[in-house]
Amino acid sequence: MDLIKEFERLIPEIKKNLEQASSLEHIEQIRVAFLGRKGQLAALMSKIPSVDTSLRPVVGETANSVKNQLTQLIHEYKTQLDFLTTTNRIQNFDAGLPGKRPWYGTLHPITIVLEEICSVFTSLGYTIATGPEVETEYHNFEALGIPSEHPARDMQDTFYISDSILLRTHTSSIQIRTMLKKQPPIAIIAPGRVYRRDSDVTHTPMFHQIEGLVVDKNISMSHLRGTLTAFLKTIFGAEIKIRFRPSFFPFTEPSAEMDISCHPCNNTGYVKNEICRICKGSGWIEILGCGMVHPKVFESVGYDHNIYSGFAFGLGVERIAMLKYHIEDLRIFFENDLRFLRQFM
């Protein structure tokens, strides 16, 4: 009958279409056209109810047979085309070409500088000390001789958790904890995160600091000067110029600040006849604070200042990194921009 012939006609027709298929996508289109819900086979099967009852079993059997053959043909052509595509891809593949290089992770520039600084001091015999970031007022302020009326203890500058608990504003608190637990001689550096309520192009609420402490008999300012000069020349190069100038810190006496010569302007204060933006025309860049440990600090930890003396210093790791890598905006360190971070691979 005519309906059976229409079913059987689908087999040579789909073969013709499959032989012309050039991609797996094209074969999928053919499958939908013949076997889809609105395809040719479905259209013919919708006519079966109108066939004479006695002929329906034969027509139904033919429809199922044709459907199975169509499915098998599609599978065979799809497998064959997939094999040919893979074979061509392999034949055209040049095994001698270099592969695509994946992006490798690397240390953050702050971590690089932090480890470099620690390496310099450990090579000089210092040990690394650590302490809690959530501190007491005693360890963070009082034991260091910072009185209650000092501006640093104001709510505007310090993150307070309670009346006497705060986020440490410097790692000097580690120095206090170390001296309370250990008798001299002491030579430590205390790296870590510290927190202050400040945020602009040169300040962030959280930053990294390294403080150092040396305590022993007959420690003098010359030991401080020699140690820090050697450190700065190792970090920035032997040609760097260094100067000490008087300063004030509650926990050291005498106190000083160290400056290094400004590299962009070569210590002149000017770049192309314009005032240097880095050093503001002075030719010098403040790099760290230091001084001899104040006798009151020794008293607070039970050391006899008539027997022992020592020096302390502190520096910001981000500031060192900014100068070392010529970065003007501190905040870029914390933006996780891969374009920036990949420069340090």
UniProtKB/Swiss-Prot annotation:
Top-level EC class as recorded in UniProt: ligase
- Explain how, and how many, cofactor molecules are bound: Binds 2 magnesium ions per tetramer.
Q: Which CDD domains match?
A: PheRS_alpha_core (cd00496)
| Cofactor(s) this protein requires | Mg(2+)
The superkingdom of the source organism is Bacteria
Pfam families, sorted: Phe_tRNA-synt_N, tRNA-synt_2d
| One term under GO cellular component | cytoplasm
Where in the cell is the protein located? Cytoplasm
Keyword Lyase recorded: no
Q: What is its main location?
A: cytoplasm
Name the keywords, alphabetized.
Answer: Aminoacyl-tRNA synthetase, ATP-binding, Cytoplasm, Ligase, Magnesium, Metal-binding, Nucleotide-binding, Protein biosynthesis
Give the residues the record marks as binding Mg(2+): E253
Family membership: Belongs to the class-II aminoacyl-tRNA synthetase family. Phe-tRNA synthetase alpha subunit type 1 subfamily.
The molecule here is called Phenylalanine--tRNA ligase alpha subunit
List the source organism.
Lawsonia intracellularis (strain PHE/MN1-00)
> Gene name on record?
pheS
